[in-house]
Structures are given as C-alpha cells and as structure tokens.
Amino acid sequence: MSTKSMIRDVELAEEVLSEKAGGPQGSRSCLCLSLFSFLLVAGATTLFCLLHFGVIGPQREEQSPAGPSINSPPVQTLRSSSQASSNKPVAHVVADINSPGQLRWWDSYANALMANGVKLKDNQLVVPADGLYLIYSQVLFRDQGCPSTPLFLTHTISRIAVSYQTKVNILSAIKSPCHRETPEWAEAKPWYEPIYQGGVFQLEKGDRLSAEINLPDYLDYAESGQVYFGIIAL
C-alpha cells in the first residue's frame, strides 16, 4: 500500500468518527484519534523516505576502489596466460665485440637470454618447437667519409628448415649511406646507418636461423645493445 493511500484512509476514518462522536467524550476521542493519525502518517512518511533513498532495505554490493577481487575469473585467466607464456622459447643474443671483422653472436654477455630450449649453434639459433615466432634483428654501421665506389650495406635473416635443408632469406634489407664521394679537400664527416628487421613466421622444430651482414668491418660496437638478434615464441 502506498503512503498516499494510507493518508487517505486515515482522513476518511477521522471524518466518520467525528460525525459519530458527540459531547466532551467525543471531543477527547477525536483528539486521541487525531494524535494517533498524525503519528501513523508521520511514521509512514518516514518509512517511505528511508526506503526511497536506500537507507534501509536490500544492500548493494560495493566494490573496493582497487577494483574486483583478486579471485575474480579475469585475473585468474591473466595469471594463467602469463604463466603459460613464461614457458615459451625465447632467445636474445648480442654481437661479440671481441671478434672484429666478423659478426659472431654471443649468449653470455649481459642482457643476452636463452630460455626454454633455444640453442645457439654454429652462429645460428636452433628452434626447439613448432609454432609461430617473432624474429628480429638490428645492426648498426658507421664510418667517416664516403669512398669513390658505391657503398651498399646489407642485413639478411635466413632460415634453414628441417623439411628442405635449403638456406632461404626470410628478411632482407639494403642501404647506402653514401650518395657521392667525399672530396679530398673536404672533412670526412662521420655517418651512421642502422638497419632493423622483424617479422612473424611459422617455424618447425630443428629449424636454424641466422642473421648476417656483408661488411662487418663497418659494424659499430661503441655502445651495448646496438647489434642483436632474437626470437620469441608467440
């Protein structure tokens, strides 16, 4: 029953009793009835307000400012996915600065990484399992001045698959830092030429991957992290 209906019923009851009541006793009865009616209406109004503004009644479940509980399914799914990805093959090798005149990959320097079955053999990364892999590599060339003959710098990533044992280039780039010869009377200014390559490939267990260049004498080893090669299982 709504509050308006309750008030209407009380008013009708007052009118009926007022007509029937007479004399002093009737006046006192009307006064008591009016007081009771007022209290009833006030109580009903208060109850309606409390229910309307949610002070009483069913309580809503509140979320903490930090978000959902740590036991919620999305967090569990994310944790499971993270644990699964940590078991995937990954490798990151860097250039051996103690091998001038050639590009030799090394897995024992700081920031190098070999995990979950990947091996470095004969300067090649050996894939431990079938799947999709991100393959990436960067080299940095540098020198001063430009020769009279054209200078072309190449960077190639190749694959030797277990299924056909033929070396195939899967990523390749070529750059020319010099557009004209530096005159004899001019100052030979330094130049830098980075080449970065990366792509996703379907590989098989036992595939061998190599990253090579054509002119290792131009490699820049001045800073760590400039020449690297790696794979990440997806």
Curated annotation (Swiss-Prot):
GO molecular function terms attached to this record: cytokine activity; tumor necrosis factor receptor binding
InterPro entries assigned to the protein according to its UniProt record, in alphabetical order: TNF, TNF_alpha, TNF_CS, TNF_dom, Tumour_necrosis_fac-like_dom
GO biological process: extrinsic apoptotic signaling pathway via death domain receptors; immune response; necroptotic signaling pathway; negative regulation of protein-containing complex disassembly; positive regulation of apoptotic process; positive regulation of canonical NF-kappaB signal transduction; positive regulation of extrinsic apoptotic signaling pathway; positive regulation of JUN kinase activity
Membrane-topology annotation of the record: Single-pass type II membrane protein
PANTHER family: TUMOR NECROSIS FACTOR (PTHR11471:SF23), TUMOR NECROSIS FACTOR FAMILY MEMBER (PTHR11471)
SUBUNIT field: Homotrimer. Interacts with SPPL2B.
The protein's name: Tumor necrosis factor
